[in-house]
């Protein structure tokens, strides 16, 4: 989507503002602009306020405080991860910017809270999706586990997830699955919203793994991701909040869902991390661990419905 957006911006021929919400995304755009267009972009954020270049990449946090200064400077505005537009910080920028062309980019047009209904108000009704030949259709492996997800509604949801995440047997299952797919030649991404689970699984996996959570600064994250790209490491344990969007590591080809997901847009975003084309890349695989219990079964059926809707092949194995 980065490449496509730059091609559109170049064709429109307008001074362009690209709005992002993380340093990782900003760096990604900087690199792609230089690689694709051969120019240096301007930066708004991290103490910089560079508005002279024909393309400027801005962090939303900084831009929201200075939008009145640049509201009439740009003919095109591109909002990356545009599903955030329902947040006032993002929508305020779009509302105040007088750009003729407003483009939103996202891996999904759905939000679990239903706020995707406002997307048309900001970006119109034209929707363009990449052709299937631009990515590799993954297969899904469902792993039947004997670990039980608590069903009692009297127990807070967070504690129910923790009961699974901190279960030593479950941790070993996750680490084992990651190692198995790495042994098959995959670069494996294991995602969870429980940092302790990720750290423990990384320890169990050993020297072939790294763990990226919000505790690491951007420089350290980049160094660890580079180890995956170069083949120094094969397994990446990453927090859901970081790898749910805005991360491009084309070498990744296997996704292990380490904690239950009941959010179709998030699931689609996570799968998007492993399906990008790369020469020599084998067919991506989504490893979905099915737990015991009524709640877990209901969520598992919902995920399976997503896979079927997307046309993914599904196979079931016992752990």
What positions do the PLM features span?
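Conserved nucleic-acid-binding Ia/Ib motif block in the N-terminal RecA-like helicase ATPase lobe
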Residues: 14-65
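Conserved RecA-like P-loop NTPase helicase motor core
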Residues: 64, 214-310
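Motif I (Walker A/P-loop) of helicase-class P-loop NTPases
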Residues: 2-10, 174
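Conserved helix/coil segment N-terminal to the catalytic DExD/H
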Residues: 46-76, 87-92, 242
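Conserved strand-helix element at the start of the C-terminal RecA-like helicase core
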Residues: 15-26, 163-172, 177-203, 307
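Conserved interdomain linker/interface between the two RecA-like ATPase lobes of SF2 helicase motors
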Residues: 129-188
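Conserved helicase ATPase core of P-loop NTP-dependent helicases/translocases
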Residues: 27, 40-52, 189, 199-200, ...
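Post-DEXD/H (motif II) to motif III coupling segment of the RecA-like Helicase ATP-binding lobe
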Residues: 75-76, 83-141, 307
């Amino acid at each position: 989507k980065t490449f496509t957006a730059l091609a559109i911006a170049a064709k429109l021929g307008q001074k362009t503002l690209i709005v992002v919400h993380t340093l990782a995304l900003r760096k990604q755009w900087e690199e792609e602009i230089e690689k694709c267009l051969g120019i240096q972009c301007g930066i708004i954020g991290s103490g910089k306020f560079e508005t002279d270049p024909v393309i400027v990449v801005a962090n939303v946090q900084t831009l929201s405080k200075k939008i009145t200064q640049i509201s009439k400077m740009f003919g095109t505005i591109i909002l990356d991860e545009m599903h955030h537009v329902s947040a006032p910080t993002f929508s305020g920028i779009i509302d105040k910017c007088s750009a003729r062309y407003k483009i939103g980019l996202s891996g999904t047009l759905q939000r679990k809270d239903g706020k995707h209904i406002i997307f048309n108000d900001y970006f119109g009704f034209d929707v363009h999706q990449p052709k299937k030949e631009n990515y590799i259709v993954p297969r899904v492996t469902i792993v039947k586990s004997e670990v039980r997800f608590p069903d009692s509604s009297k127990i807070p949801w967070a504690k129910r997830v923790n009961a699974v995440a901190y279960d030593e047997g479950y941790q070993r299952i996750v680490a084992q699955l990651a190692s198995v797919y790495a042994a098959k030649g995959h670069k494996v991404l294991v995602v969870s919203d429980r940092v302790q689970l990720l750290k423990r699984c990384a320890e169990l996996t050993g020297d072939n793994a790294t763990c990226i959570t919000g505790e690491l600064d951007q420089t350290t994250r980049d160094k660890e991701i580079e180890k995956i790209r170069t083949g120094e490491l094969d397994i990446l344990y990453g927090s859901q909040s970081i790898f749910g969007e805005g991360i491009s590591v084309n070498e990744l080809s296997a996704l292990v869902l380490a904690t239950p997901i009941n959010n179709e847009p998030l699931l689609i975003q996570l799968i998007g991390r492993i399906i990008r084309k790369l020469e020599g890349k084998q067919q991506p695989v989504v490893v979905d661990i099915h737990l015991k219990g009524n709640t877990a079964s209901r969520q598992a059926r919902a995920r399976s419905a997503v896979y079927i809707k997307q046309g993914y092949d599904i196979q079931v194995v016992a752990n």
